[in-house]
Design a protein with these regions (language model features):
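A short helix-loop-beta-strand connector motif used in the catalytic cores of GNAT acetyltransferases and
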Residues: 28, 33-54, 67, 121, ...
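A short, well-structured alpha-helix characteristic of acyl/acetyltransferase catalytic modules
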Residues: 9-19, 133-134, 144-156, 268-278
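Amide-forming acyltransferase catalytic core, primarily the GNAT-like/NAT-type
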Residues: 116-200
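Conserved acetyl-CoA-binding loop-helix of GNAT-fold acetyltransferases
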Residues: 73, 79-92, 113, 209-222
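Conserved beta-strand in the GNAT
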Residues: 45, 51-60, 66-72, 185-194, ...
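Helix-loop element at the rim of GNAT/NAT acetyltransferase active sites that forms part
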Residues: 18-30, 153-164, 223
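Flexible loop/N-cap segments at domain edges
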Residues: 187-193, 199-235
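Active-site/acyl-donor-binding loops of N-acyltransferases
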Residues: 103, 109, 114-133, 230-282
């Protein structure tokens, strides 16, 4: 069986989304269209006799940084080299950029052999955030803040500027994007979106634990409004305040990944990152 790897269309990716759901990755309802907006050439499918058997994404953000995700092989065809062949074909899309990924424990040794070094662990916390005792104050819809201020805040928390991603991410169908404003200044923002099971929160960027707490409560309330009392939040252990916040709301760890890179990245405000945006695109 000969594997042929080619770029995937948005229509092709509907099948990959189904694979993700089967794997328990809880894909967001509107993720694919936003992901493709960032880099429509960064999605790949491997086929045998015309049938899709593998997938991967290598999404370029700028001239220096790329992110790898969606590394999948159909379960009945694993162990035949299709995954590695797909990986090698797609990784060329990154060129000489530093590549990041969030790897599950079972694959981390393989990623190390491919030149990835661990930076920190990320734990997914899942559960039902209790309704706050009183209305959350200082949190507004993100469209009420200056777009340039929002973009600058996001850029401080991510290894690359990502305007092609950010604008649709905060406005995609079903997404609820909220900003924390303190004394007229933007001090955080977050997004919650419907997904296959629990609603997913990400990013959750904030100046302080108090700002993050207000945003988490407000985002969880928004999730209830679209029928999702339970949320899933991917929190980096590099910011210990993130786990403390999750545990204070009764969320429980579900699984963990490791953020890994092939080289240097620009500095980020790690103490502001209470939840990463997605495990698929970083």
């Amino acid at each position: 069986m000969t594997l042929h790897v080619s770029r995937a269309s948005l229509q092709d990716w509907a099948l990959v989304r189904d694979w993700c759901a089967t794997e328990g990755w809880n894909p967001g309802a509107a993720d694919a269209s936003v992901f493709f907006a960032q880099d429509p050439d960064g999605f790949f499918v491997g086929r045998v006799d015309g049938e899709p058997v593998s997938a991967i994404s290598v999404v370029n953000y700028d001239a220096d940084y790329s992110f790898l995700g969606f590394y999948l092989v159909r379960p009945d065809l694993r162990g035949q080299g299709h995954g590695l062949a797909t990986w090698r074909a797609a990784l060329a899309h990154a060129g000489d950029r530093t590549v990041g990924l969030d790897g599950v424990p079972a694959q981390q040794d393989n990623y190390r052999r491919s030149g990835f070094a661990p930076a920190y662990r990320t734990a997914r916390y899942v559960g039902e955030v209790p309704l706050p005792d009183r209305p959350v104050t200082g949190v507004v819809p993100v469209d009420r803040v200056d777009p340039a201020a929002l973009a600058a805040y996001d850029s401080a928390c991510h290894p690359a500027d990502r305007p092609r991603f950010l604008t649709p991410w905060v406005s995609a169908p079903g997404h609820r994007a909220l900003a924390r404003v303190t004394d007229g200044r933007l001090t955080g923002y977050g997004v919650v979106r419907p997904a296959e099971s629990e609603a997913r929160i990400g990013p959750l960027f904030a100046d302080t634990p108090a700002d993050a707490s207000a945003l988490l409560d407000a985002l969880a309330t928004e999730a209830r409004a679209f029928g999702a009392p339970r949320v899933a939040v991917d929190m980096p252990e590099a910011n210990p305040a993130a786990a403390r916040l999750a545990l204070s709301r009764g969320l429980e760890p579900s699984f963990e990944t490791a953020r890994m890179y092939t080289g240097p990245i620009r500095p980020v405000a790690q103490d502001r990152i209470f939840a990463v945006t997605t495990l698929e695109l970083g």
